[in-house]
Amino acid sequence: MKPGSPPHGAVMLAGLALMAVLASVIFALSRSAVVSADKARSMALADASAKSVATWYAQVLNYDAYTNRAIAANEIMMAQAVTMVAWTQYVEELAQNIGTVAALIPALQPVATWVQQVSTVTHQLATTGALLEVPLRSAYTRALQSSQSIMHTSANAFAAQALVNEVVWTGDPRFFGQLIASTSPSSFFNFTRNFTGEERADFASLIRNSQDSYSRQRGFTQRLYLMPTVSCIPRNLDQAFARLNRRGGTWLTADLQDWESADTLSIHTWRRRSRWNPTCGGTGESIPLGWGAADASVSGSDGMNEDPAGLRVNPSAFARARDQAVSIPGYLGLSSHRELTDITQQARRDALIRVPVLVRLDMGKIAKIKAGSKVFDAKASGSETSRAAPLGDALWSLGVAETYFLRPPDTLGGRSEREFANLFAPFWESRLVLANSADRAVAIALAQARGNK
């Protein structure tokens, strides 16, 4: 063949063959790229939808923790209100009794009168505030508990599936996602429940322990050095003087239906052992100086039902406090609350919720590439360990997430021990995890069942 002459014969055939090979390679690469992109998108959508549901569950559980804390805080605030009413009544009675004594000293009368007026106004303000505050706060605790039930009712299996659909279809409307039954669809619903009746005992203990020390129990016993013992022969220094006994406290009753508070102050003097033994034996209440009591109860009845603060040390003052107790209506009792269904230590250690999601893309929806008049369907070759693989007439991906409890180390206050799952600390989180054998078995069964149709 002369230089510059057009190609012909075997050279032309070789060129056409080379062009065909190049076209086939380009097509194969394009086909592989399309399927690889859909495979990656399928895995991403499975992970995103599973993580979204697990995060939603974590948010609901954290809401339970915050509302449980809010219920406890409102109970403590009601206890403080009842404490203020009892204490201001106690101060008012004490001021009046001191004023009676001060009336014998003209120079002290103006001061005593001013103290009486201030104490009376303070008690009236405290009572008015408590009458408004206790019903509102008690109703608010009921609203918080109701909101917990509403949140858990809304977080059902149908809503979780709707969230999966929203995440998947927002990412790519060609895909379809579903929660699979390797984990019970009602696992989140059964994970927690309302604690009522006697089940609230631990919650009540938490509230009692959260009271400040003064509200919980306030009292002292002091010697009155200005009041020496004259009715018997002292045998030691302590018996040489009278005693000033102060007792008071605020408590939630055992039936969890009342907040009670009382304060008493009395002078105790030493008594002789017997008519024939003039030495000092024991003390007895001689002069009640101050008393006050308040009761916020479901029944609205006056009086003290219990005495965990030792108020009966001053029997006369305590009797007057009970007779004059201020009744604060509107308290609805300790609210029920949400807690883990199984509160054993082992269950709380292993508490978590698994969310497995299977995402499907029908092969008919995978992009198709035409070469001349022939249509080539994109097919992927996935290994058994791949989370996205073709089976039957669809591409399948499995994503699994967990809702779990983990308190950050910097919030443990230097403690080395681990805090187990509970609904009082808002540290519920979500994470992606590997599928287990049950997840894979259910996913394969669903894929095969669809392929056999």
Tell what function each PLM region has.
Residues M1-A86:
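Alpha-helical assembly-interface signal, strongest on the long, hydrophobic N-terminal helix that forms
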Residues A72-K453:
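Long, compositionally biased low-complexity segments
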